[in-house]
């Protein structure tokens, strides 16, 4: 098969794709103000909520996301209204402290890592994030080159910032006339969230789950040596999609910082889940069972504050991360 020259371009035809691009992320935090300062004031997302849920909705939410019966909580949504395919962030605000999924901001620590934002130019966003009090993880914007498949280089400008609960926010701009790695607002030049990443200890195991259960495809697998320590970075996409990609990062055992041991899912704080639209929840849950994945919540109907009326289920990825699948139901 002749591969596209741009590694971000689709390989397989997406007309029969079982699963769409990453559509939602679940973030659990007690610090809504700081999260809002980062995502809304810094990156331009719109905040909706807190929402009032009736008893039946709360029952469904507790089952779907694993929220204990004795834990009170509120829900908000952060979204980029003018970019319909941007990831919608469900924010769960518990009424008491829950464990943090990550111990530190360290890149090498195993666990859910970041949401990523594509943009045409990074400098203005970088200045704003610094003014808002967020620490850039490097002394300056990181400027480096990647290669197209024919070997030609193209420039990348990237910066990551420490936000809440030991997670990061990544801003990235592709140069050389290439499209960004997700849709951007034509007026602001900023898009996303459009991708998300996990630091994992077994990339092949995680890749098998996302390709065999969710029908994703691998687009890139690189050894990144422009950072120290070096790491392997694999990108997975929905068939036919140019946004909503997953990044899996693996360090050599000697370079890893171990996981906190806190399960990477609600009600624990941090980046706690991903949400994917599917053609059939039943088909995907059957595939999950076939490949030995644990079903966290069986399919049920409920009103999701991001996606409306859905049939949804949740499945455990091999690392224990919460994966939500949903199909929209006509009103």
Show where each model-derived region lies:
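Vicinal oxygen chelate
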Residues: 1-18, 27, 50-51, 85-91, ...
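Flexible internal linker/loop segments at domain or repeat junctions
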Residues: 235, 240-266
